[in-house]
Amino acid sequence: MFLRSFLCLLCLLPSILYCADLEIHVRAESSLLPVNVSLLSSPKDTKQGSYLASLRDLFARDLALGDLLAPTKEIAPLTVFIEASYPELIFSIKKDGKGAQKIFSLELSGNPSKDHQSIHEAADRIHFLLTHTPGISSGKIIFSLCSTNSSEELKQGELWSVDYDGQHLAPLTNEHSLSVTPAWMHISHIPAYIYVSYKLGVPKIFLNTLSQPTGKKILAMQGNQFMPAFSPKTKLLAFISDRDGNPDLFVQSFSLATGAIGTPKKLLNEAFGTQGNPSFSPDGTRLVFVSNKDGTPRIYQMQIYPEQHPPRLLTKKYRNSSCPTWSPDGKKIAFCSVIKGVRQICVYDLASGRDEQLTTSAEHKESPSWAADSNHLVYSAGSSSTSELFLLSLITKKSRKIVIGSGEKRFPCWGAFPSQHIKKAS
Protein backbone atom coordinates (compact mmCIF):
# COMPACT_ATOMS: atom_id res chain seq x y z
CA MET A 1 0.00 0.00 0.00
CA PHE A 2 2.92 2.36 0.62
CA LEU A 3 3.88 2.49 -3.05
CA ARG A 4 0.38 3.27 -4.23
CA SER A 5 -0.23 5.85 -1.49
CA PHE A 6 3.08 7.53 -2.27
CA LEU A 7 2.38 7.67 -5.98
CA CYS A 8 -1.12 9.04 -5.36
CA LEU A 9 0.07 11.63 -2.92
CA LEU A 10 2.86 12.79 -5.18
CA CYS A 11 1.34 11.09 -8.03
CA LEU A 12 0.11 16.83 -29.76
CA LEU A 13 -2.11 18.48 -31.73
CA PRO A 14 -3.23 17.42 -35.18
CA SER A 15 -1.69 19.54 -37.89
CA ILE A 16 -3.91 22.44 -38.96
CA LEU A 17 -5.92 21.89 -42.09
CA TYR A 18 -6.36 25.17 -43.91
CA CYS A 19 -9.24 25.55 -46.31
CA ALA A 20 -9.80 29.10 -47.52
CA ASP A 21 -13.32 28.63 -48.85
CA LEU A 22 -14.73 26.59 -46.01
CA GLU A 23 -15.40 28.34 -42.69
CA ILE A 24 -17.47 26.23 -40.33
CA HIS A 25 -17.00 26.65 -36.59
CA VAL A 26 -18.94 25.51 -33.55
CA ARG A 27 -18.28 26.45 -29.95
CA ALA A 28 -18.08 24.04 -27.05
CA GLU A 29 -21.13 25.59 -25.41
CA SER A 30 -23.30 25.45 -28.52
CA SER A 31 -25.68 22.65 -29.42
CA LEU A 32 -24.30 19.74 -31.41
CA LEU A 33 -23.80 20.39 -35.11
CA PRO A 34 -25.52 17.70 -37.26
CA VAL A 35 -23.19 16.22 -39.86
CA ASN A 36 -24.34 13.72 -42.46
CA VAL A 37 -21.62 11.13 -43.10
CA SER A 38 -22.12 9.41 -46.47
CA LEU A 39 -20.10 6.56 -47.91
CA LEU A 40 -19.89 6.54 -51.71
CA SER A 41 -18.62 3.18 -52.87
CA SER A 42 -19.00 0.37 -55.37
CA PRO A 43 -17.32 -2.52 -53.56
CA LYS A 44 -16.13 -5.46 -55.60
CA ASP A 45 -17.64 -7.93 -53.11
CA THR A 46 -19.67 -8.18 -49.92
CA LYS A 47 -16.61 -8.50 -47.71
CA GLN A 48 -15.09 -5.29 -49.03
CA GLY A 49 -18.43 -3.52 -48.71
CA SER A 50 -18.78 -4.59 -45.08
CA TYR A 51 -15.24 -3.43 -44.35
CA LEU A 52 -15.84 0.01 -45.88
CA ALA A 53 -19.14 0.35 -43.99
CA SER A 54 -17.36 -0.47 -40.73
CA LEU A 55 -14.79 2.24 -41.45
CA ARG A 56 -17.57 4.73 -42.15
CA ASP A 57 -19.18 3.86 -38.79
CA LEU A 58 -15.84 4.23 -37.02
CA PHE A 59 -15.34 7.62 -38.65
CA ALA A 60 -18.76 8.73 -37.39
CA ARG A 61 -18.01 7.56 -33.84
CA ASP A 62 -14.71 9.42 -33.95
CA LEU A 63 -16.43 12.65 -34.99
CA ALA A 64 -18.94 12.27 -32.15
CA LEU A 65 -16.23 11.70 -29.55
CA GLY A 66 -15.48 15.40 -29.15
CA ASP A 67 -19.08 16.16 -28.04
CA LEU A 68 -19.39 18.99 -30.57
CA LEU A 69 -20.67 17.16 -33.66
CA ALA A 70 -23.65 14.86 -34.19
CA PRO A 71 -22.89 12.49 -37.10
CA THR A 72 -25.99 11.11 -38.77
CA LYS A 73 -27.10 9.16 -41.83
CA GLU A 74 -30.02 11.58 -42.20
CA ILE A 75 -30.03 14.66 -44.43
CA ALA A 76 -28.21 17.60 -42.81
CA PRO A 77 -26.99 21.06 -43.94
CA LEU A 78 -23.45 19.73 -43.72
CA THR A 79 -22.28 16.50 -45.37
CA VAL A 80 -18.97 14.67 -45.22
CA PHE A 81 -18.54 12.36 -48.21
CA ILE A 82 -16.20 9.38 -48.05
CA GLU A 83 -15.65 8.33 -51.64
CA ALA A 84 -14.14 4.86 -51.84
CA SER A 85 -12.07 3.93 -54.86
CA TYR A 86 -10.41 1.04 -53.12
CA PRO A 87 -7.82 1.25 -51.66
CA GLU A 88 -8.11 5.06 -51.75
CA LEU A 89 -10.61 7.03 -49.67
CA ILE A 90 -11.31 10.64 -50.68
CA PHE A 91 -12.90 12.95 -48.10
CA SER A 92 -15.06 15.88 -49.23
CA ILE A 93 -17.34 18.37 -47.48
CA LYS A 94 -20.58 19.82 -48.81
CA LYS A 95 -22.29 22.74 -47.08
CA ASP A 96 -25.82 24.11 -47.59
CA GLY A 97 -26.34 22.40 -50.94
CA LYS A 98 -23.22 23.86 -52.51
CA GLY A 99 -20.75 21.73 -54.43
CA ALA A 100 -18.65 19.25 -52.50
CA GLN A 101 -15.08 20.35 -51.82
CA LYS A 102 -12.34 17.72 -51.69
CA ILE A 103 -10.22 18.00 -48.56
CA PHE A 104 -7.77 15.09 -48.46
CA SER A 105 -7.36 11.41 -49.21
CA LEU A 106 -5.81 8.35 -47.61
CA GLU A 107 -4.88 4.87 -48.78
CA LEU A 108 -6.12 1.77 -47.01
CA SER A 109 -3.71 -1.05 -46.25
CA GLY A 110 -6.18 -3.83 -45.53
CA ASN A 111 -4.68 -4.12 -42.04
CA PRO A 112 -7.51 -3.21 -39.62
CA SER A 113 -5.18 -1.71 -37.00
CA LYS A 114 -3.42 0.56 -39.51
CA ASP A 115 -6.64 1.46 -41.31
CA HIS A 116 -8.41 2.29 -38.05
CA GLN A 117 -5.57 4.65 -37.13
CA SER A 118 -5.86 6.29 -40.56
CA ILE A 119 -9.60 6.77 -40.04
CA HIS A 120 -8.95 8.24 -36.58
CA GLU A 121 -6.55 10.73 -38.14
CA ALA A 122 -9.03 11.59 -40.89
CA ALA A 123 -11.82 12.16 -38.38
CA ASP A 124 -9.60 14.39 -36.27
CA ARG A 125 -8.70 16.47 -39.34
CA ILE A 126 -12.36 16.92 -40.26
CA HIS A 127 -13.26 17.65 -36.63
CA PHE A 128 -10.70 20.44 -36.49
CA LEU A 129 -11.88 21.91 -39.79
CA LEU A 130 -15.50 21.99 -38.64
CA THR A 131 -14.98 23.13 -35.04
CA HIS A 132 -11.48 24.64 -34.80
CA THR A 133 -11.05 22.23 -31.90
CA PRO A 134 -8.57 19.34 -32.15
CA GLY A 135 -10.07 15.92 -32.67
CA ILE A 136 -9.02 13.34 -30.10
CA SER A 137 -9.71 9.92 -31.62
CA SER A 138 -6.19 9.36 -33.00
CA GLY A 139 -4.45 9.90 -29.67
CA LYS A 140 -2.92 6.88 -27.94
CA ILE A 141 -3.44 6.22 -24.24
CA ILE A 142 -0.49 4.58 -22.49
CA PHE A 143 -0.93 3.09 -19.02
CA SER A 144 0.41 0.55 -16.55
CA LEU A 145 -1.32 -2.83 -16.47
CA CYS A 146 -0.53 -4.29 -13.07
CA SER A 147 -0.99 -7.42 -10.97
CA THR A 148 -1.06 -7.66 -7.17
CA ASN A 149 -0.13 -10.15 -4.49
CA SER A 150 -2.05 -10.97 -1.32
CA SER A 151 -0.76 -7.85 0.44
CA GLU A 152 -2.13 -5.67 -2.38
CA GLU A 153 1.32 -4.23 -3.12
CA LEU A 154 1.96 -3.60 -6.79
CA LYS A 155 4.59 -6.14 -7.83
CA GLN A 156 4.70 -6.16 -11.63
CA GLY A 157 3.20 -4.00 -14.32
CA GLU A 158 4.12 -3.54 -17.94
CA LEU A 159 3.17 -0.51 -20.02
CA TRP A 160 0.49 -0.85 -22.70
CA SER A 161 -1.20 1.40 -25.25
CA VAL A 162 -4.86 1.48 -26.28
CA ASP A 163 -7.27 3.56 -28.35
CA TYR A 164 -10.02 5.61 -26.72
CA ASP A 165 -12.58 2.88 -27.48
CA GLY A 166 -10.54 0.05 -25.94
CA GLN A 167 -9.44 -1.25 -29.33
CA HIS A 168 -5.92 -2.14 -30.45
CA LEU A 169 -4.55 -2.91 -27.00
CA ALA A 170 -0.80 -3.42 -27.44
CA PRO A 171 2.12 -4.09 -25.07
CA LEU A 172 4.86 -1.46 -24.98
CA THR A 173 7.36 -2.86 -22.49
CA ASN A 174 8.54 -6.38 -21.73
CA GLU A 175 10.77 -5.80 -18.72
CA HIS A 176 9.26 -8.25 -16.19
CA SER A 177 9.18 -5.53 -13.59
CA LEU A 178 6.99 -2.72 -12.29
CA SER A 179 6.64 0.25 -14.67
CA VAL A 180 4.51 3.24 -13.66
CA THR A 181 3.65 6.89 -14.44
CA PRO A 182 4.32 6.93 -18.21
CA ALA A 183 4.31 10.38 -19.81
CA TRP A 184 4.41 11.28 -23.51
CA MET A 185 7.22 13.67 -24.39
CA HIS A 186 5.17 15.40 -27.15
CA ILE A 187 8.16 15.85 -29.44
CA SER A 188 6.82 16.41 -32.98
CA HIS A 189 6.06 13.09 -34.69
CA ILE A 190 8.33 11.00 -32.44
CA PRO A 191 6.24 8.72 -30.17
CA ALA A 192 8.70 8.89 -27.25
CA TYR A 193 7.69 8.57 -23.63
CA ILE A 194 9.31 8.54 -20.20
CA TYR A 195 8.35 6.39 -17.26
CA VAL A 196 9.55 4.98 -13.95
CA SER A 197 10.73 1.37 -13.79
CA TYR A 198 11.81 -0.80 -10.86
CA LYS A 199 13.77 -3.23 -13.03
CA LEU A 200 17.05 -2.16 -11.41
CA GLY A 201 15.60 -2.76 -7.96
CA VAL A 202 14.91 0.91 -7.21
CA PRO A 203 12.73 3.36 -9.15
CA LYS A 204 14.58 5.13 -11.96
CA ILE A 205 13.41 7.18 -14.96
CA PHE A 206 13.60 5.54 -18.39
CA LEU A 207 13.05 6.72 -21.98
CA ASN A 208 11.41 4.61 -24.66
CA THR A 209 9.50 4.74 -27.95
CA LEU A 210 6.60 2.68 -29.28
CA SER A 211 8.96 0.49 -31.29
CA GLN A 212 11.17 -0.77 -28.44
CA PRO A 213 10.28 -3.33 -25.71
CA THR A 214 12.82 -1.99 -23.20
CA GLY A 215 13.69 1.53 -22.16
CA LYS A 216 16.97 3.32 -21.47
CA LYS A 217 17.85 4.89 -18.11
CA ILE A 218 18.36 8.59 -18.65
CA LEU A 219 19.77 9.97 -15.37
CA ALA A 220 22.95 8.99 -13.49
CA MET A 221 21.64 10.73 -10.37
CA GLN A 222 21.62 8.86 -7.05
CA GLY A 223 18.43 8.14 -5.12
CA ASN A 224 14.95 7.05 -6.07
CA GLN A 225 13.31 8.88 -8.98
CA PHE A 226 9.57 9.36 -9.47
CA MET A 227 6.91 11.08 -11.59
CA PRO A 228 8.75 12.48 -14.62
CA ALA A 229 7.31 15.24 -16.79
CA PHE A 230 8.90 16.82 -19.86
CA SER A 231 8.47 20.14 -21.65
CA PRO A 232 9.43 20.10 -25.36
CA LYS A 233 9.34 23.93 -25.35
CA THR A 234 12.02 24.51 -22.70
CA LYS A 235 13.59 21.02 -22.96
CA LEU A 236 13.31 20.56 -19.22
CA LEU A 237 12.64 17.32 -17.39
CA ALA A 238 10.89 17.67 -14.02
CA PHE A 239 10.83 14.82 -11.52
CA ILE A 240 10.85 13.88 -7.84
CA SER A 241 13.88 12.38 -6.08
CA ASP A 242 14.81 11.56 -2.49
CA ARG A 243 18.52 11.94 -3.19
CA ASP A 244 18.88 14.31 -0.24
CA GLY A 245 16.51 12.39 2.03
CA ASN A 246 13.25 14.24 1.37
CA PRO A 247 11.17 13.71 -1.80
CA ASP A 248 12.09 16.93 -3.60
CA LEU A 249 11.26 18.54 -6.94
CA PHE A 250 14.11 18.68 -9.48
CA VAL A 251 14.49 19.92 -13.05
CA GLN A 252 17.06 18.71 -15.55
CA SER A 253 17.91 20.03 -19.02
CA PHE A 254 17.33 17.17 -21.43
CA SER A 255 17.63 16.52 -25.15
CA LEU A 256 16.23 13.49 -26.93
CA ALA A 257 19.36 13.42 -29.07
CA THR A 258 22.06 13.85 -26.40
CA GLY A 259 20.32 12.96 -23.13
CA ALA A 260 20.78 14.82 -19.85
CA ILE A 261 22.60 18.16 -20.10
CA GLY A 262 24.43 19.37 -17.00
CA THR A 263 23.28 18.43 -13.51
CA PRO A 264 19.80 18.33 -11.95
CA LYS A 265 18.63 21.42 -10.05
CA LYS A 266 16.63 21.11 -6.83
CA LEU A 267 13.94 23.79 -6.89
CA LEU A 268 12.82 23.89 -3.23
CA ASN A 269 14.24 23.10 0.19
CA GLU A 270 12.97 20.89 3.01
CA ALA A 271 10.78 23.71 4.36
CA PHE A 272 8.40 22.98 1.49
CA GLY A 273 7.74 19.46 2.77
CA THR A 274 7.25 16.43 0.57
CA GLN A 275 6.78 17.41 -3.08
CA GLY A 276 5.33 15.48 -5.99
CA ASN A 277 3.31 15.27 -9.21
CA PRO A 278 4.99 17.98 -11.34
CA SER A 279 3.23 19.07 -14.54
CA PHE A 280 4.42 21.70 -17.02
CA SER A 281 2.42 24.54 -18.51
CA PRO A 282 2.21 24.21 -22.32
CA ASP A 283 4.95 26.82 -22.80
CA GLY A 284 7.22 25.06 -20.30
CA THR A 285 7.79 28.13 -18.13
CA ARG A 286 5.69 27.06 -15.12
CA LEU A 287 5.06 23.98 -13.04
CA VAL A 288 2.18 22.85 -10.90
CA PHE A 289 3.03 20.35 -8.20
CA VAL A 290 1.91 18.98 -4.84
CA SER A 291 3.40 19.84 -1.45
CA ASN A 292 2.35 18.90 2.08
CA LYS A 293 4.20 21.75 3.75
CA ASP A 294 0.97 22.83 5.49
CA GLY A 295 0.17 19.32 6.73
CA THR A 296 -2.01 18.04 3.90
CA PRO A 297 -1.10 17.77 0.21
CA ARG A 298 -2.09 20.90 -1.70
CA ILE A 299 -1.38 22.19 -5.19
CA TYR A 300 1.08 24.98 -5.94
CA GLN A 301 2.10 26.84 -9.07
CA MET A 302 5.61 28.15 -9.74
CA GLN A 303 7.42 29.89 -12.57
CA ILE A 304 10.73 28.14 -13.25
CA TYR A 305 11.87 29.56 -16.61
CA PRO A 306 13.65 31.74 -17.62
CA GLU A 307 14.03 32.54 -13.92
CA GLN A 308 12.52 30.95 -10.83
CA HIS A 309 9.80 32.66 -8.80
CA PRO A 310 8.44 31.61 -5.38
CA PRO A 311 5.59 29.06 -5.44
CA ARG A 312 2.05 30.15 -4.72
CA LEU A 313 -0.97 28.16 -3.61
CA LEU A 314 -3.25 27.36 -6.54
CA THR A 315 -6.53 26.42 -4.88
CA LYS A 316 -7.68 27.07 -1.33
CA LYS A 317 -10.98 25.22 -1.63
CA TYR A 318 -9.58 21.69 -1.47
CA ARG A 319 -6.92 20.77 1.11
CA ASN A 320 -6.17 17.13 0.23
CA SER A 321 -5.21 17.20 -3.44
CA SER A 322 -2.87 15.38 -5.82
CA CYS A 323 -2.09 14.63 -9.47
CA PRO A 324 -2.37 18.13 -11.02
CA THR A 325 -2.08 18.23 -14.81
CA TRP A 326 -2.07 21.29 -17.08
CA SER A 327 -4.44 21.34 -20.05
CA PRO A 328 -2.92 21.65 -23.56
CA ASP A 329 -4.59 25.04 -24.08
CA GLY A 330 -3.04 26.33 -20.84
CA LYS A 331 -6.37 27.45 -19.39
CA LYS A 332 -7.18 24.70 -16.89
CA ILE A 333 -5.57 22.38 -14.38
CA ALA A 334 -7.20 19.04 -13.59
CA PHE A 335 -6.42 17.38 -10.28
CA CYS A 336 -7.66 14.88 -7.71
CA SER A 337 -9.03 15.90 -4.33
CA VAL A 338 -10.53 13.98 -1.41
CA ILE A 339 -14.15 15.13 -1.06
CA LYS A 340 -16.33 13.50 1.59
CA GLY A 341 -13.81 10.69 1.90
CA VAL A 342 -13.56 9.89 -1.81
CA ARG A 343 -10.86 11.05 -4.21
CA GLN A 344 -12.64 12.87 -7.05
CA ILE A 345 -11.57 14.59 -10.28
CA CYS A 346 -11.72 18.39 -10.19
CA VAL A 347 -10.67 21.18 -12.52
CA TYR A 348 -9.32 24.65 -11.77
CA ASP A 349 -9.96 27.48 -14.22
CA LEU A 350 -6.92 29.76 -14.27
CA ALA A 351 -8.76 32.81 -15.65
CA SER A 352 -11.61 32.82 -13.14
CA GLY A 353 -9.84 31.14 -10.23
CA ARG A 354 -12.80 28.79 -9.79
CA ASP A 355 -12.72 25.09 -8.90
CA GLU A 356 -15.25 22.57 -10.18
CA GLN A 357 -15.83 19.00 -9.04
CA LEU A 358 -16.33 16.80 -12.11
CA THR A 359 -16.99 13.34 -10.65
CA THR A 360 -19.17 12.13 -7.78
CA SER A 361 -19.18 8.30 -7.83
CA ALA A 362 -17.91 6.26 -4.89
CA GLU A 363 -14.70 4.93 -6.47
CA HIS A 364 -11.40 6.68 -5.81
CA LYS A 365 -10.10 8.44 -8.93
CA GLU A 366 -6.44 8.96 -9.82
CA SER A 367 -4.08 10.24 -12.50
CA PRO A 368 -6.18 12.49 -14.78
CA SER A 369 -4.61 13.15 -18.19
CA TRP A 370 -5.84 15.58 -20.84
CA ALA A 371 -6.83 14.86 -24.42
CA ALA A 372 -5.56 17.26 -27.09
CA ASP A 373 -8.82 19.26 -27.12
CA SER A 374 -8.61 20.30 -23.43
CA ASN A 375 -12.25 19.19 -23.12
CA HIS A 376 -11.72 15.53 -22.21
CA LEU A 377 -9.74 13.56 -19.66
CA VAL A 378 -8.75 9.96 -19.10
CA TYR A 379 -8.33 8.77 -15.51
CA SER A 380 -8.20 5.59 -13.46
CA ALA A 381 -10.77 4.67 -10.82
CA GLY A 382 -11.30 1.80 -8.43
CA SER A 383 -10.03 0.49 -5.12
CA SER A 384 -6.70 -0.60 -3.66
CA SER A 385 -6.84 -3.86 -5.64
CA THR A 386 -8.88 -3.01 -8.76
CA SER A 387 -8.64 -0.14 -11.20
CA GLU A 388 -10.19 0.68 -14.58
CA LEU A 389 -9.74 3.51 -17.09
CA PHE A 390 -12.49 6.04 -17.80
CA LEU A 391 -13.04 8.90 -20.25
CA LEU A 392 -14.53 12.11 -18.86
CA SER A 393 -16.09 14.91 -20.91
CA LEU A 394 -15.98 18.43 -19.48
CA ILE A 395 -18.74 19.30 -21.96
CA THR A 396 -21.29 16.67 -20.92
CA LYS A 397 -19.83 16.01 -17.42
CA LYS A 398 -20.24 12.29 -18.13
CA SER A 399 -17.73 9.45 -17.72
CA ARG A 400 -17.55 6.15 -19.57
CA LYS A 401 -15.40 3.10 -18.98
CA ILE A 402 -12.77 1.97 -21.47
CA VAL A 403 -13.39 -1.77 -21.66
CA ILE A 404 -9.99 -3.45 -21.86
CA GLY A 405 -10.01 -6.69 -19.85
CA SER A 406 -8.60 -7.96 -16.58
CA GLY A 407 -5.84 -6.45 -14.44
CA GLU A 408 -5.26 -3.12 -12.72
CA LYS A 409 -5.07 -0.25 -15.19
CA ARG A 410 -3.35 2.76 -13.66
CA PHE A 411 -1.44 5.95 -14.53
CA PRO A 412 -2.99 6.69 -17.96
CA CYS A 413 -1.47 9.33 -20.23
CA TRP A 414 -3.20 10.52 -23.42
CA GLY A 415 -0.95 11.59 -26.29
CA ALA A 416 -1.52 13.01 -29.77
CA PHE A 417 0.73 13.06 -32.82
CA PRO A 418 0.66 14.64 -36.31
CA SER A 419 -1.12 12.66 -39.00
CA GLN A 420 1.03 10.14 -40.84
CA HIS A 421 -1.41 8.78 -43.42
CA ILE A 422 -3.25 11.83 -44.80
CA LYS A 423 -2.61 13.37 -48.22
CA LYS A 424 -4.03 16.78 -49.15
CA ALA A 425 -6.36 16.81 -52.10
CA SER A 426 -4.79 18.06 -55.31
UniProtKB/Swiss-Prot annotation:
GO terms for cellular component: periplasmic space. Keywords: Periplasm, Signal. Transmembrane segments: none annotated. Residues 1-19 form the signal peptide. InterPro entries: 6-blade_b-propeller_TolB-like, PD40. Its main location: periplasm. It holds the Pfam family PD40. This is Protein TolB homolog.
